[in-house]
């Protein structure tokens, strides 16, 4: 059985051939738009598909057709291939064009995408710092009491026996009053001199004056 009606043996430039080619171009364009809208491809992929479709067909878009026309054309071409075992020129053109388009899409999808300004960066958790050990505040006394030091204190440590023997030759101890919070040596020296003057003028020194 030969079904010659699947092929159109007309000359180039005839109106029927131009109409048929324009329908094929519409088919490729429509299929390209379906693929572009049905997948999550970027704008470049859609542009490449359109360029590949137009380059593969090389014809102008004149005739409008719908999804029903696409289904009918697919069925007719399938029946023609099954009966004659020879695909028509339009099917070969479609296969070549779609192969090129799919290769282009695969190369685009496999290539790393440029960073988009709408992309939300992943929030990386900040590294946890070790807890800082806080020392309790130091409790200060309300008012430090003045300490009384001996004038000959801090002149070197002597043994117990030496200290007992030299006690007779030592001059009498003079008390030295340290003011709280005072670290100035000049002020301390001035206070010591005033105490000595008082001891010289008072009868019996400070101890004798206190015993009166």
Swiss-Prot record:
Compositionally biased region (Basic residues): 138-148
Positions of region (Disordered): 119-184
Keywords: Early protein
Superkingdom of the source species: Viruses
Record's protein name: Probable protein E4
Originating organism: Cottontail rabbit papillomavirus (strain Kansas) (CRPV)
């Amino acid at each position: 059985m030969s079904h010659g009606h699947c092929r159109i043996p007309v000359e180039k430039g005839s109106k029927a051939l131009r109409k048929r080619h324009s329908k094929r171009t519409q088919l490729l364009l429509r299929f390209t738009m379906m693929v572009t809208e049905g997948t999550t491809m970027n704008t470049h992929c859609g542009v490449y598909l359109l360029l590949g479709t137009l380059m593969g067909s090389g014809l102008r878009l004149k005739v409008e057709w719908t999804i029903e026309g696409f289904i009918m054309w697919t069925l007719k071409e399938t029946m023609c291939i099954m009966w004659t075992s020879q695909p028509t020129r339009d099917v070969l053109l479609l296969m070549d064009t779609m192969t090129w388009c799919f290769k282009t899409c695969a190369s685009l999808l496999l290539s790393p995408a440029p960073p988009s300004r709408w992309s939300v960066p992943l929030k990386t958790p900040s590294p946890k710092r070790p807890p800082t050990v806080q020392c309790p505040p130091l409790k200060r006394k309300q008012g430090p009491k003045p300490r009384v030091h001996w004038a000959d204190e801090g002149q070197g440590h002597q043994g117990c026996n030496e200290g007992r023997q030299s006690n007779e030759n030592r001059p009498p101890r003079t008390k030295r009053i340290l003011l709280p919070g005072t670290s100035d040596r000049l002020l301390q020296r001035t206070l010591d001199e005033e105490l000595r003057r008082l001891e010289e003028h008072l009868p019996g020194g400070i101890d004798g004056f206190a015993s009166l």
